[in-house]
């Protein structure tokens, strides 16, 4: 499992067309917390449990996290 980045979370939420409120309902993490996580440096303040919920929700919605050494972080939609 690759490390999730702020950019990937932003890109995935945007690709799905979800507002913070919609994303919050889907992943059971407060909209305020999601906003904080999506801010620069926000991952440092996120709990492992919240990051797990975010990743699982986005993957269940058809998001694949891509990118590796030499590549920038990205996302791809499968559904």
Regions found by a protein language model. Give the residues of each.
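A detector for short, charged/polar N-terminal pre-domain segments
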Residues: 1-4
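Residue-level recognition of specific faces of alpha-helices
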Residues: 8, 33-36, 74
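Short basic helix-loop element that most often maps to the first helix and adjoining turn
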Residues: 9-22
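Residue-level detection of the helix-turn-helix DNA-binding "recognition helix"
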Residues: 14, 28, 39
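Short alpha-helical DNA-recognition segment
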Residues: 19-36
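Short, charge-rich, low-complexity interaction segments located
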Residues: 38-51
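DNA major-groove recognition helix of helix-turn-helix/homeodomain DNA-binding modules
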Residues: 48-65
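Helix-turn-helix/homeodomain-like alpha-helical modules used for DNA recognition
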Residues: 63-79
